[in-house]
């Protein structure tokens, strides 16, 4: 029994995903923001960014979209991906969600940048929007050759 337990524990430890922080960017005066983002790389399948988003307002937010950028270690853009975030963020509420980075190959040395690019308040057709690409490019540390 002890051998079986040890084998199962070892298997779980070896199958655990690796984790590294993602760089977070945001536009001016966002109604919601990402407060933490971690890139989880499983032994099989594409990396996943686990993030927390918090509503910074006293109003309900109907929906938001998240944009993730993948840069090579030298700062060269590799991919961009957009996904819907969680629906309905109550005032000052924090929710957790994920974005699967399956738009292309992601190397372990790649740099992941994430931010909220669009937010719609409840009862409104108007969206708050941020142009994240220049912010993402500026946030990536460029390695000099």
What are these regions (language model features)?
Residues 1-13:
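Bacterial N-terminal signal peptides
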Residues 70-80:
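Short aromatic-acidic-glycine turn motif
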Residues 19-23, 102-145:
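Terminal connector regions
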Residues 78-107:
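Intrinsically disordered, low-complexity Pro/Gly/Ser/Thr-rich segments with frequent PxxP/GP/PP motifs
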Residues 59-63, 78:
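Short acidic/proline- and small/hydrophobic-mixed sequence motifs that coincide with surface turns
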Residues 18-52, 130-144:
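Low-complexity, acidic Ser/Thr/Pro/Gly-rich terminal tails and inter-domain linkers that flank the onset
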Residues 65-68:
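Hydrophobic beta-strand segments
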Residues 53-57:
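Asparagine-centered strand-capping/turn motif at beta-strand->loop junctions
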